Amino acid sequence: VHKPKRIILNTFGSFGDIHPYMAIAMELQRRGHVPVVATMEIYREKIEGAGLEFVAVRPNIPQPKEQDPELIEKIMEPKTGPRFLTEGLIFPAVRDSYADLLKAVAGADLLVTHPAAPAGPLVGRKTGTPWISTVLAPFSFISAYDPPVPPYWQWTRRLSVLGPGVVGFLLGMMKSSHKAKVVTEFRDELGLDDNGNPMFEGQHSPTRVLALFSEVFAKPQPDWPPQTEVAGFCFYDGHHETEVPPELSRFLEKGAPPVVFTLGSSAVWVARDFFRESIEAARRVGRRAVLLIGDERNMPSSLPEGVIALDYVPYLSLLPEACVVVHHGGVGTTSQGLFAGVPTLIVPFAFDQSDNAEHARKLGTSRTLYRKDYFAPRVANELTELLRQPSYARRAIEVSQKLKREDGPARAADLIEQILTRTRNSPEELAYASGD
């Protein structure tokens, strides 16, 4: 790719949705391009602090600590949360999102879109801007060959015995019950063809789909879009944002590897008794503990000897020091847990978390305990199994070694540059009807 290209990366969500795009943007910037991260206003300071260009795209959802706790509870509810998030917050803002993104892509060479930001494909198709779509987790593909495991239907992991034909039919029924009426009406107003449900097949670019996870985690399936390329996990850890606190360094040096308990950046706001039960579970198995509590509101009333609580620590620094990591199963934390090379206990809350837990379980590195069952005796039993059976630690190291041979941001940047080169050589190949 000869001259620097302006590349808009549009994303939406929690840190697990922001960090991979920041990692790719930093790699593109290192190669001389001009990447722009287009997302919610609350991330401006974070993104600009990393030396990246930022553009605000609505909806402007406030920081979790400033939100009504009831709203976060609704979003994180296992069965109804995804529908509430999409139909209550994302879809109604699609016109605002479109207007903001339309300004951002003026003069851009490429648009990169996110599965939960439906304005992105509309902007790409309407303007003729070449665009690449992404998925962060295998759940987004809704594959009949690797059936998704939603948090409220754990039995679906056994569906594969029915064969892809039957599973595909059942998944089709499920997808047809999820409408994106507001988005499809706006798409029709823009004069764009029906390219499928914006939540499912309509999110995928016909040019290229980047899977931002490793083939170690989920192998490509026959019903993934044929234009899919697997880039690998794209790690960003923000060392420049948060130093490892000296008290944590001292804690780690003076004893055996602890159990690390974390709920990422979203589930931590609906932690309830998670950290209290975690302290008791660690006591029962005779292990020290590090609690990443996210906010003072989760600080336990008292911390026993051998337990330290901190708001947040970069995972790349902390997780490899653990004997076990207990987390919620967000794809960002799941990937960091696998990269760290230690066994994990995954406690899914909502969204794709139970499916990520199932993929980790199949790797032999992890066990799963659902949120409703998270009580100290059960947690202690799971921790005992992970610590007692050497296969978990052995497999965790094997998987980690494989992931360390990959470079997701570099591979993603290579695949983006391929499309940019193709655009330069034959622009008509990537031009989409504007509908004008």
What is each stretch, according to the model?
Residues 3, 216-324:
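Donor-nucleotide binding loops and adjacent catalytic segments primarily
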Residues 92-161, 216-217:
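Conserved nucleotide-sugar donor-interacting segment of glycosyltransferase catalytic cores
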Residues 69-120, 161-205:
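Conserved nucleotide-sugar donor-binding subdomain of glycosyltransferases
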Residues 2-55:
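N-terminal subdomain of nucleotide-sugar transferases
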Residues 376-436:
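C-terminal amphipathic helix plus adjacent low-complexity
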Residues 110-113, 311-359:
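A donor-sugar binding/catalytic signature common to diverse glycosyltransferases
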Residues 38-82, 155-156, 161-163:
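Conserved nucleotide-sugar phosphate-binding/catalytic loop shared by glycosyltransferases and other
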